Amino acid sequence: MAKRIKDPGEKSRIRATIFDKLNRRGKWGPIHTSKENALKGIPSHDIGIAKDILEEAIKEGFLVPKHTGYGDHVSLNFKKNGEIMAIIASLLAG
């Protein structure tokens, strides 16, 4: 079970960090990476909530799931490019 977030901006920061990492690595559409790699670099005390945020992003359509023989992978959704870039820009602005 993930910890409860006291600061609502913390959830946005973690989401933007995940999206920024995938964007910088070019993980759009058919180019995917494992869920574990998407979460690398997140502080260990935030991993639980980051996993929940990753699952929420899949349900909301920001991330596209890809089931492979060696685990579940994700990539950024081209159709939500504008929204994803706005979320990343909010991270860089703050």
Where are these regions (language model features)?
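Minor-groove-contacting beta-hairpin "wing" of winged helix-turn-helix DNA-binding domains
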Residues: 70-76
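Short alpha-helical segments that sit at the start of domains
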Residues: 1-24
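Short, amphipathic alpha-helical interaction segments positioned at domain boundaries
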Residues: 79-94
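Short amphipathic alpha-helical interaction segments
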Residues: 43-59
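Charged interaction/catalytic cores of defense and host-pathogen modules
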Residues: 52-54, 65, 74
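A short, conserved structural fragment
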Residues: 58-68
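Residue-level marker of regulatory loop/turn positions in helix-turn-helix DNA-binding domains and
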Residues: 7, 11, 31, 46
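Short acidic, hydrophobic short linear motifs in intrinsically disordered regions
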Residues: 28-42
